From Swiss-Prot:
Name under which the protein is recorded: Bifunctional NAD(P)H-hydrate repair enzyme Nnr
Residues the record lists as binding (6S)-NADPHX 1: 162
Chain's role: Bifunctional enzyme that catalyzes the epimerization of the S- and R-forms of NAD(P)HX and the dehydration of the S-form of NAD(P)HX at the expense of ADP, which is converted to AMP. This allows the repair of both epimers of NAD(P)HX, a damaged form of NAD(P)H that is a result of enzymatic or heat-dependent hydration.
Organism for this UniProt entry: Vibrio cholerae serotype O1 (strain ATCC 39315 / El Tor Inaba N16961)
Keywords (A to Z) from UniProt: ATP-binding, Isomerase, Lyase, Metal-binding, Multifunctional enzyme, NAD, NADP, Nucleotide-binding, Potassium
Pfam family, one: Carb_kinase
YjeF N-terminal domain mapped to chain residues: 17-219
EC number in record: 4.2.1.136, 5.1.99.6
Amino acid sequence: MDTIMPLPTHFYTTQQLKQGEQDAASERGLELFHLMERAGQAVFTIAFAQYPTSHHWLICCGGGNNGGDGYIVAVLARHMGIDVTVWQLGDPEKLPADAHRAYQQWKELGGAVYAPQSEVPESTDVIIDALFGIGLKEVLRPQVVPLVELLNQSGKPIVAVDVPSGLCADTGQVMGTCIKAQHTVSLIGLKQGLVTGQARCYVGTLHYAGLGVEEVFAQHNTPSLVSIDGKLRHSLLPPRQACTHKGQNGKALIVGGNEGMGGALILCASACARSGAGLSAAMTHPDNVTAMLTITPEVMSTSWNKQHLFEERIEWCDALALGPGLGRDAQAQQIMQRLSSLKVPKVWDADALYFLAHNPSYDAQRIITPHPVEAARLLGCEVEEVEQDRFAAIRQLQQRYGGVVVLKGAGTLVDDGKEIAVCLQGNPGMASGGMGDVLTGIIVALLAQKIPLADAAKLGVWLHSSAADLNTKSHGQRGLLASDLLPHLRELLN
């Protein structure tokens, strides 16, 4: 996700923000109007920094306190010599007290207020979206939709106040239609709905302004979401001892790659070997063994039809990855039955999740890594329901299946039953085949190195997304392959 300055690592719900804003202001001895002034100042400062040569701003104000923030921006922009046009949705005389006070300041400057027009003024350089704030829980009213569409189609850059209008700040769901902002300025506390799912298409570059009350707010509110910190790798992966040997660095077993699906296993095994496992082994369909030995000679690859070797590998491994290219035939089902109860840390993906959906089980030693379609199958619901509230979906998955859940997608989430974490790294180039197989390989390598389940899942997701970001910085997003991530893993791990 695009940011300019490092963001805080904690995110909150709208309920926390609504009450916490008042409490923090009170504890600081501030009127809520003074907090509104600070909000407007923050939005103006960030917008002007992004568009310093702009001359004409269109500020769109709604009927709540978000609109009041917009009027403060209008006053500040006018003082800077910027031409300002204000569009007000609804009657400004019915604004809440603090927002009405801001409106009066604008009027005292001689500022005009207009109802939304059918066209955006041609001279507009910047649009400020102060229509709807964090309180939006319902689909936008039909009479508002044309305005949102007009602003989106104008081709003008949009800076959203706190949250793009039309986006649910708790879930990231688009409530019918939504402002597509180039920049969003989140105030006091970052909202959890800004960083996952559909929100990633609408927020643009995310900025944060604490308004001088962030410390007080944080003292009284437990985050509903935390971001994954890449510094985690330094504590989890300390420098290796000079006398270490491969057996001490973890033994990972990967089972998958049915007939015609060997590529998934090759990607997974390659990622495992590149992620620091001391020894990596694979059990696969006999058709894939030669390719595995040729492409990844570091991985000990054997046919899963050799039953005695299969059993030896099961006893040998420190961690298991099950599912990449496994298939859904009778043999795959037998393998699932044999390995389901294995008492080692494990990560299940792809076809393993298909079998899990049809034969649910709870396992505290397992990581599952569904994408939204797989998550919907595991929950017995529609994909749209998963994407409408990814937080609710991942909580249900963790409660039903245990262990750690990684809900993949834009703004991947990780839930260990204690907290939910989000990955801010990653980019649209990752929407290509084989990416999930690489993630599974990374995670099983970390598990084999005795990293706890939750930490392995979080660090694995961060490494995976960060490797993709490193590659696309040099080569662009379109055409990114899962195998392109492999060289960067070693760099990030060290």
